[in-house]
Structure formats: structure tokens, C-alpha cells
Amino acid sequence: MKTTKEQQNGEMKDNNLPQDVANQTESVNESRRRFAKSSLAVSGVLLTLASRPSLGSGGGFGGGGMCKSPSGLMSGNLSVHGSPQRCSGRTPGYWGNHGGGGPQPNAWPSPYLPGSCQKKCTNSSNWSNGTKFSSVFNCNGNGSRYNNYSLMQVLWLGGRGDPYQLGAHIVAALLNAQKGWTPVLTVAQVKNIFNEWNDKGYFEPTAGIKWYAADIVYYLKSTMPE
């Protein structure tokens, strides 16, 4: 377990994450290199975006919380003039700490329920009840590993139970969309991303471009600058 603290609006924010999750967060450069080498490298647009400031520098592609929809990201429009979309989504660590056992209990948006935890709430198995992951997403294919877990449990599975942290970031994206913090992603779009990956092993933001698990996570992080 690793605890990090960030200064935000004059207050300290604790982010408690499993060690493997924290390590992934700290290896932004490695994520960017993997992203550039992935199937997304087919698009020169994405190579340009991947070379911009890291997601830790204000969040979003280009920093400052700027974000794009999956299809918009592929369009090639890099202009920041006019009224760019800005996302204020929260990370999996935020939502994991703002449920029934966190410092701000019951902060999840309706109708999603975090469930309850009596002790060691950073351990996925210590959570009970809560909205089932399979009641929101299809889990009959590549997503079968998440079938028996709640949304909160998926947040705390860690890298071994949740490769690339895809499940955790999908849950965070779902809650962010329900809160209205990601104007480029609706709840329906988040569900579609995961369900298509469940069926095919990848998601196509546009015809012929395939986003695999690591690519989807990289994109979702761009909507979570907070």
C-alpha cells in the first residue's frame, strides 16, 4: 500500500492505492511509450497528443483538463480555440476512498452504491453488497473476471486481479460520467467502450482503429485530471 498526498484548493488530498496501482500511476512515461507503440500509433494525431505534457501536468491531452471523446480524438482536430471541452473526472483512487468505508461516505452518485466495509477497506474482499459490476456491464466474454465483483471491489482488485487496471478505470469513468464531470463521455458511452472490449478484446473509436486494454486506460486517464 502506498499513500500519496496532493495539494488541491488549499487542502491535502489523500490517495490510497494498492502498491501496483501507485507504481502504474508513477510510470507515466512508460505508459506514453507503450501508447505510442500500440495500434493507436496508426494515427499521427495520437502520436502528437502522446508527445504533449503528461496527464499529471493538469490532466487531459495537452494539460489543463482538456479532453476529447474517443471519436473526437481520432478526428485530427487539435485546435484549442473556441470552447474546448474540459473534464474534471476523478481517479479510481478517489472513488475507492469516497465510498461506504472512505473519509467521505456515500459520496457515489445515484443509482450506484459502494457497499459497506468494516475494516481494511483497501482490500477488495472486505467489501460487501454494493452495485454489481455485471449489473452495469457485460461480463460474458473478456470481462468475465469481473463477473462476481461489485463496482467497489473492482476498484480495489489491484493489478493482478485487474490487468492494466481496466476495470478500475472503467468504474471511475462510469461514476465520473454519472456526476457530469466528463462532458465528452456519457454513461452510455462508457458502457459501450467496456462492452465492446468484452465482446472483441478491443474497442474501435473509429472504424479500423483498435484500442486494447492498455490503450483504453490511457484514454480514460485523460478524462481524470483531478
Regions found by a protein language model. Give the residues of each.
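Intrinsic-disorder/low-complexity peptide segments enriched for small residues
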Residues: 10, 15, 38, 44-47, ...
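A general structural-boundary detector
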Residues: 22-23, 43, 82, 158
